[in-house]
Amino acid sequence: MKDNFSFAATSRNITSSLPFDNLNATGTNESAFNCSHKPADKHLEAIPVLYYMIFVIGFAVNIVVVSLFCCQKGPKKVSSIYIFNLAVADLLLLATLPLWATYYSYRYDWLFGPVMCKVFGSFLTLNMFASIFFITCMSVDRYQSVIYPFLSQRRNPWQASYVVPLVWCMACLSSLPTFYFRDVRTIEYLGVNACIMAFPPEKYAQWSAGIALMKNILGFIIPLIFIATCYFGIRKHLLKTNSYGKNRITRDQVLKMAAAVVLAFIICWLPFHVLTFLDALTWMGIINSCEVIAVIDLALPFAILLGFTNSCVNPFLYCFVGNRFQQKLRSVFRVPITWLQGKRETMSCRKSSSLREMDTFVS
């Protein structure tokens, strides 16, 4: 199928693009299309290599998390169930990266047909939302463990069986626009068949802005509100606790880990969502500066790349930092892990209920 694309519109969207629905086809916002900068290819040459690096590292560490969960004997904790589903979402997201790396390598020429374009575009969006939603669930679960320790000790795995399907359903619903609109279109002046969001031409600007704002709200603003609120709640509660000796060390570890979760989420996803929001403003005609559009085009592929690194960081934030990680790893793979060995003293003083419950997240 062929569409008519203006040089400026195509240039803008080709360079701003790909997995997260920012690679679009045409539009009606004339002010955004009066910029005649050409697609910049040189700065994209490193992107496929970086995609493969993230794929290899992220796939390896998340496979370890899934293996630990599957080989774990006895009843599973609620937090472990969330961590497992987070790792699965990250694995599925990372599994699509080789295709998008190939897409970049061929300068946005999609080689895998329209069905694969729709499926893998939707697959990526679905698991991006699922990963973010499970990070939010983990933050809420940790908050409950600290603020309501006795109540949280009564949690049963079946409670997570209600939350997990709900999260996956929400992720599926969030990816429906991608599934509906993602398709292959021919861009004649570039000589490529691009995998794009094929919105109706007469309402292209409205759809583009709406989808961008949806990603901002569902994929960043709402999760960040929950994650940050839980962190400050944990911090306020623990700082009120009189802790001494080893109890204080545990408290400080918990606070550092909670802060690391917030910082990792912001560092990995804020650049992408800021650029996505600016892109929405250009579609709405609020931003008409060619310089701003050029910056969006240049920076967005790297912001997307930074967002993908969150899938590599998650296992270290939620699994690998624990005191019992070495024992779990050795029990699964039956090999000595000397590089993880270290002396740990047993706590001699009694912990408060909050710290004792929260210690399960650093053990």
Swiss-Prot record:
Annotated positions binding angiotensin II: Y103, Y104, R182, Y204, K215, D279, D297
TM regions (residue ranges): 46-70, 81-104, 115-140, 160-181, 207-232, 258-281, 295-320
Membrane association type: Multi-pass membrane protein
GO cellular component, one term: plasma membrane
Glycosylation sites recorded in the entry for this protein: N4, N13, N24, N29, N34
Subcellular compartments: Cell membrane
Disulfide pairings: C35-C290, C117-C195
Main location: membrane
Residues exposed to the Extracellular side: 1-45, 105-114, 182-206, 282-294
Tissue: Abundant expression in fetal tissues, immature brain, skin wound and atretic ovarian follicles.
Molecular functions per Gene Ontology: angiotensin type II receptor activity; G-protein alpha-subunit binding
Record's comment describing the protein's domains: Helix VIII may act as a gatekeeper for either suppression or activation of the receptor, depending on post-translational modifications and interactions with various receptor partners. Helix VIII is found in a non-canonical position, stabilizing the active-like state, but at the same time preventing the recruitment of G-proteins or beta-arrestins. Upon switching to a membrane-bound conformation, helix VIII can support the recruitment of G proteins and beta-arrestins.
Subunit record text: Interacts with MTUS1.
Name assigned to this protein: Type-2 angiotensin II receptor
Organism, as annotated: Rattus norvegicus
